[in-house]
Every structure is written in C-alpha cells, then in structure tokens.
Swiss-Prot record:
Residue segments, region Disordered: 231-288
Molecular function per GO: DNA-binding transcription factor activity; transcription cis-regulatory region binding
Biased composition (Low complexity): 250-278
Gene transcribed to yield this protein: ERF055
DNA-binding region: 142-199
Role: Probably acts as a transcriptional activator. Binds to the GCC-box pathogenesis-related promoter element. May be involved in the regulation of gene expression by stress factors and by components of stress signal transduction pathways.
Naturally occurring in which organism (per UniProt): Arabidopsis thaliana
InterPro entries registered for this protein in UniProt: AP2/ERF_dom (IPR001471), AP2/ERF_dom_sf (IPR036955), DNA-bd_dom_sf (IPR016177), ERF/AP2-like (IPR051758)
Disulfide bonds: none
GO cellular component, one term: nucleus
GO biological process: ethylene-activated signaling pathway; regulation of DNA-templated transcription; response to water
Pfam families: AP2
Family: Belongs to the AP2/ERF transcription factor family. ERF subfamily.
Full protein name: Ethylene-responsive transcription factor ERF055
Length: 314
C-alpha cells in the first residue's frame, strides 16, 4: 500500500485528486464534516474500493469498517471503508445503530399500510384461516314456517290442515316478524294444538296472539282467507262424493239381499224341503203301479229263443 502511494504512480494519483479534496473541504462548514474529510483524505483509495452511497446492509459484512457522515436522519452519513477500525468513533456507532432501526421501522410501517390498502375483493388478497368478520353469517335459529329469499327478505307460509296446500302470510324484514305472523295464523287454524315458534307468548288472555303487538297486525287479505277457511264445512267436496258413493253401494247391496232368499225358497221346494202335500204328490208321480204276480205272465212276457216255453208250460 505504501508502494502504491509512495511511488511515482502514487504521487501522480494524489496530485490528480487534490482539487477534489480541496473543494470538498471548503464546502463543508460543520467541524465534524471537516474532520471526516480529513479522514477521507487520508484514505484516497476509498473512492475506488467502495460506492459513494449508503449501503443499509453494510453491517452484514464484518470485514469492512464504516465511516459516518451527516445525513437527514441522525446527522451522519455512513460510507463503507476497507481500512481498519482506527477511523471509527463511538458517536458513529450510535448514529449508525439509530439509522438502521429507523429504516427497519419505516419498512414495517410501509408493509402494514400496503396490507391495509389491499381490499378482499382484489385478486391478490390472501384470506386468513378462521372466521372472517365480513362474511354474512346465517341465522343461528330457524323458525317454523319461515324461509329466506335470496335477496335477504323473509317469507312466512303455513300449510293448511285439510288440503295440505300452503297459504302465503307475507314478506318481512326480519325472521322474527315472519315467525310471529306464522304463530298467529297457526293459532287461528289449530288452536291450542298449534306448534308455535314462541310458546312463551301463548297468550296471556287465552286467545289468539294480540294483533297490536310489536310487529303489527296480520294483513287483512290473509286474515280474510283464514276466516274463510275456518267457515268452510269439515267435509270437503271430494270427501262428500266418496261418502255418497259408499252409501249408494250399501243401498244396492241391501236391495239385492231380499231377492236371494226367494230364489233359494223355490229351489227348496223342488228339493223336497217344501210343504207335506207337495212331497206326497211328487212321491205318487214317481212310484209305478204294482202288478199282481203271475209266473206265466212273467215268463211269457220274456220269451227266449233257446228255451221252448210252450212245451214247458203245457
């Protein structure tokens, strides 16, 4: 190193760099900056061995020492140097440590701000595992006769006990309103046997739920339908037709039953189960008249070509 600066080439290099050293020393008004320039002048090859800007990762390389100069954060600027630690001062270490901490905290704050600017709708957003606060949560409790539309409204319906059809009760903003409307309609149709969503509201007066409650009265059209259903007779047209058919079949069978015994009575007379006079007449007609026994007559009545009955009888 001495040969490099002490030789002929070293002298020429020092002479060439002398104007730059003078301009730097005259422009610096701070005494700390002037002392740093003296240290920088004592190491002329520092311009060739390292860059002239601050390297935030200079602390990762222990083989290089650092020289601090004033900056906007702590009043000093750090330049890497390849010389020993004889140029280091305690205040330079403190300023360098403060500057590195400032850079680290600033980087973390910038990352936090960037994460806050990213919205969940953007494609680069990564969802965290676990329950999210922005997701729409389903209701914890489902009510009888209540269902939700896809746009968020709630609908109440009740199944009629006779023809098993659904009666629409209305559209509501909340599930509780729809459940209460179902309870009113169910109590009107089924009375005390109705299964309600709010059994605790059954009902201090012993009648149907109060229509002047928190959620307002039932719609007039729905109430009219319920009254019409209650006013209908219990037997529906389909059931009356079935009962009339059954009655007609029973009457036809009862009309056919008396004619059957008459036919059996006629057949009974022919079988001999009738009156005694008829039995006697039948027996007389069936019996043949008795003829007196006569051997000659009998033998002559039955001639034979093999036997000469005339010679036998003579």
């Amino acid at each position: 190193m001495a040969d490099l600066f002490g030789g002929g080439h070293g002298g020429e290099l020092m002479e060439a760099l002398q104007p730059f050293y003078k301009s730097a020393s005259t422009s610096a008004s701070n005494p700390a900056f002037a002392s740093s320039n003296d240290a920088f002048a004592s190491a002329p090859n520092d311009l060739f061995s390292s860059s002239s800007y601050y390297n935030p990762h200079a602390s990762l390389f222990p083989s290089h020492s650092t020289t601090s100069y004033p900056d906007i954060y702590s009043g000093s600027m750090t330049y890497p140097s390849s010389f020993g630690s004889d140029l280091q001062q305690p205040e330079n270490y403190q300023s360098q440590f403060h500057y590195q901490n400032t850079i680290t905290y600033t980087h973390q704050d910038n990352n936090t701000c960037m994460l806050n600017f990213i919205e969940p709708s953007q494609p680069g957003f990564m969802t965290q595992p676990g329950p999210s606060s922005g997701s729409v949560s389903k209701p914890a409790k489902l009510y009888r006769g209540v269902r939700q539309r896809h746009w968020g409204k709630w609908v109440a319906e009740i199944r009629l006990p006779r023809n098993r059809t659904r009666l629409w009760l209305g559209t509501f903003d909340t599930a509780e309103e729809a459940a209460l409307a179902y309870d009113r309609a169910a109590f009107k149709l089924r009375g005390d046997s109705a299964r309600l969503n709010f059994p605790a509201l059954r009902y201090q007066t012993g009648s149907s739920p109060s229509d002047t409650g928190e959620y307002g009265p039932i719609q007039a059209a729905v109430d009219a339908k319920l009254e019409a259903i209650l006013a209908e007779p219990k037997n529906q047209p389909g059931k009356t037709e079935r009962t009339s058919r059954k009655r007609a079949k029973a009457a036809a069978s009862s009309a056919e039953q008396p004619s059957a015994p008459q036919q059996h009575s006629g057949s009974g007379e022919s079988d001999g189960s009738g009156s005694p006079t008829s039995d006697v007449m039948v027996q007389e007609m069936c019996q043949e008249p008795e003829m007196p026994w006569n051997e000659n007559f009998m033998l002559g009545k039955c001639p034979s070509y093999e036997i000469d009955w005339a010679s036998i009888l003579s």
